[in-house]
Protein backbone atom coordinates (compact mmCIF):
# COMPACT_ATOMS: atom_id res chain seq x y z
CA UNK A 1 0.00 0.00 0.00
CA UNK A 2 1.25 3.47 -0.84
CA UNK A 3 2.06 5.74 2.15
CA UNK A 4 -0.24 8.39 0.68
CA UNK A 5 -3.34 6.36 1.52
CA UNK A 6 -2.14 5.67 5.04
CA UNK A 7 -1.28 9.33 5.56
CA UNK A 8 -4.72 10.42 4.30
CA UNK A 9 -6.49 7.96 6.61
CA UNK A 10 -4.38 9.11 9.54
CA UNK A 11 -5.17 12.75 8.79
CA UNK A 12 -8.89 12.05 8.60
CA UNK A 13 -8.80 10.11 11.87
CA UNK A 14 -6.81 12.87 13.55
CA UNK A 15 -9.39 15.39 12.34
CA UNK A 16 -12.09 13.39 14.13
Swiss-Prot record:
Protein name per Swiss-Prot or TrEMBL: Temporin-1Tr
Top-level taxon: Eukaryota
Localization terms from the record: Secreted
Chain's role: Antimicrobial peptide.
A GO BP annotation: defense response to bacterium
Family to which this protein belongs: Belongs to the frog skin active peptide (FSAP) family. Temporin subfamily.
Modification type Leucine amide: residues: 16
Keywords: Amidation, Amphibian defense peptide, Antibiotic, Antimicrobial, Immunity, Innate immunity, Secreted
Primary subcellular site in the record, as a coarse category: secreted
Tissue: Expressed by the skin glands.
Record-level GO cellular component terms: extracellular region
